[in-house]
């Protein structure tokens, strides 16, 4: 039999090891810095697809002949893609248990990204506070930076989001077979 644990998920059955399920409001401490674990090498196809998907018609992103005549010499990666990528990289540490994003502020793009750059990111918790209107969530503000393979910052912003409090996370659907199909292995 399983019983609820503090996160609002069910306790694992004997022999199961729970995976990472994300932070809850009480886990955020102002001053903590998270180096997000996954980098992404941006390909030309990533830039082309995102730019066309969002109907951005700037030649800076999609026309290599035009871009060859600019000071950069190559197409620049769409900055909205860079924002989405770095926000996505941060979710494992910041917002797996998000209730809602409240906003991105002070977005800065100090250095261009081009196809072939590998982007990494980190975030620092700036503040936490209880929500005045929703007792089941708290509000967290972070500063996030994305940087390339050379350590050059390519984007920075502040992000504010609501995240569930401990004991208030909605129950997760558990899709699993009735019995384990894994072979027995002695360790």
Where does each model-flagged region fall?
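Hot-dog-fold acyl-thioester-processing enzymes
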Residues: 2-103, 155, 166-187
């Amino acid at each position: 039999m399983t019983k609820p644990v503090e996160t609002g998920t069910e306790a694992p059955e004997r022999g199961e090891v729970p995976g990472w399920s994300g932070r809850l409001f009480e886990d955020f401490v102002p001053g903590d810095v998270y180096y997000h674990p996954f980098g992404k090498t941006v390909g030309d196809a990533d830039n082309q697809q995102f730019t066309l998907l969002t109907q951005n018609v700037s030649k800076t992103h999609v026309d290599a002949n035009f871009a060859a005549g600019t000071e950069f010499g190559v197409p620049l990666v769409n900055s909205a893609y860079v924002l989405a990528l770095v926000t996505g990289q941060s979710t494992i540490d910041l917002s797996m248990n998000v209730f809602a994003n409240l906003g991105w502020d002070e977005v800065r793009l100090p250095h261009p990204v081009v196809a072939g750059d590998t982007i990494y990111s980190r975030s620092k918790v700036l503040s936490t506070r209880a929500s005045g209107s929703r007792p089941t969530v708290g509000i967290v503000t972070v500063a996030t930076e994305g940087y390339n393979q050379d350590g050059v910052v390519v984007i920075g912003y502040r992000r504010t989001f609501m995240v569930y409090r401990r004991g208030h996370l909605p129950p997760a659907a558990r899709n699993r077979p009735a019995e384990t199909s894994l072979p027995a292995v002695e360790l």
